[in-house]
């Protein structure tokens, strides 16, 4: 019953290191609060470039060179890099991104990477030390979004879909819809679908 669910469900999410739900600590108040798990370009920039947040986050590429390694090896390298960032560099927001892929690289499917990283961190006993954010061109609709959240993502940035929405708003001037408003409408529809 999606009409009544909105009164008892929330899309609010938190990023950062989590503590025990049984013991209240100051660390639990040090989380980044988001009204929606769907990031905009501005909120992504705040996570990666903002003065107070960039020390908490790190971007991990989800692409690899097929010449250098297999899919399994690439996944292991990603997991080990993330473990190092969490333990040694105290990063609490891990951003898995396929955005800056080069021509000689292949992109790993975002759900595969997310599932592998999520379970690797659980096995290592450090899953609650960081939130996972996925930046992917694969996310297009509310089903894709729901799958990513179910696989362990705290937030996503569907940059390619948002860019397409922006382009469509510019190409269809008769709609009288600014690119920002079109992207906001798209994010609202994803939230509603979620």
Label the model's feature ranges.
Residues 1-78, 83, 87, 95:
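Extended, highly charged accessory segments
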Residues 7-9, 13-16, 58, 115, ...:
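A broadly tuned "polar low-complexity/structure-edge" signature
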Residues 56, 67-73, 77, 83-144, ...:
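Conserved structured catalytic cores and adjacent interaction surfaces
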Residues 62-73, 104, 177, 181-185:
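Generic amphipathic alpha-helical segments used as scaffolds and interaction surfaces in large
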Residues 60-62, 95-97, 170-176:
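A short small-residue
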Residues 1, 40, 103-109, 141, ...:
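Alpha-helix initiation/capping motif
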Residues 6-7, 15-17, 66-69, 101-105, ...:
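Flexible loop/turn segments at secondary-structure boundaries
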Residues 116-194:
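Phosphate/diphosphate-binding loops
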């Amino acid at each position: 019953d999606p009409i009544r669910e909105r009164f008892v469900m929330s899309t609010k999410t938190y990023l950062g290191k989590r503590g025990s739900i049984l013991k209240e600590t100051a660390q639990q108040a040090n989380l980044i609060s988001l009204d929606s798990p769907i990031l905009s370009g501005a909120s992504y920039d705040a996570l990666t470039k903002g003065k107070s947040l960039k020390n908490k986050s790190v971007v991990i590429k989800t692409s690899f060179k097929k010449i250098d390694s297999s899919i399994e090896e690439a996944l292991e390298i990603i997991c080990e890099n993330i473990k190092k960032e969490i333990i040694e560099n105290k990063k609490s927001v891990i951003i898995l991104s396929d955005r800056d892929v080069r021509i000689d690289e292949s992109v790993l499917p975002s759900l595969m990477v997310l599932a592998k990283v999520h379970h690797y961190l659980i096995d290592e006993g450090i899953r609650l030390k960081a939130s996972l954010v996925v930046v992917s061109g694969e996310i297009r609709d509310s089903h894709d979004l729901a799958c990513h959240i179910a696989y362990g993502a705290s937030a996503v940035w569907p940059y390619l879909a948002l860019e397409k929405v922006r382009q469509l708003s510019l190409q269809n001037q008769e709609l009288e819809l600014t690119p920002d408003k079109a992207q906001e409408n798209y994010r609202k529809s994803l939230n509603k679908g979620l």
